[in-house]
Amino acid sequence: MSRGFAELMFTPHVLALQQVMGSRAASARLAGFDNPDDDRLGDGEKAFITARDSFYIATVSETGWPYVQHRGGPTGLLKVLNDHTIGFADFRGNRQYVSVGNIATEQRVSLFLMDYPNQRRLKLIGHARVVDAATDRKSVV
């Protein structure tokens, strides 16, 4: 866990609850695990990301409510574009366009990637943007 992730997720109320429940020391050790100024994807994260055949994406609606959607496809559906950026093709899906619509007004997202057989996971937070492959080919290649 990077310190940046912990700073965003461990709000004052979360920290207080960790203290009350006795997990604050362990959480503090995890929060300092990585270089605090380094939010780049490392080789381990990159390998984990590209080995996935599905993930969950959470977006925030205009009403402020979270929305979680599963995305699946062939292994490698998530592409590591650089040390700070991943991408994926959003296939037709259920044609409700809730995630894409949410991203149009609120770019904050959370991705949850799971390796079920090995009981490993990776949580990512960031900002998303929708790129139309038909009109902005350079951005997606």
Specify the residue positions occupied by each region the protein language model found.
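Binding-site signature for planar aromatic cofactors or substrates
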Residues: M1-V141
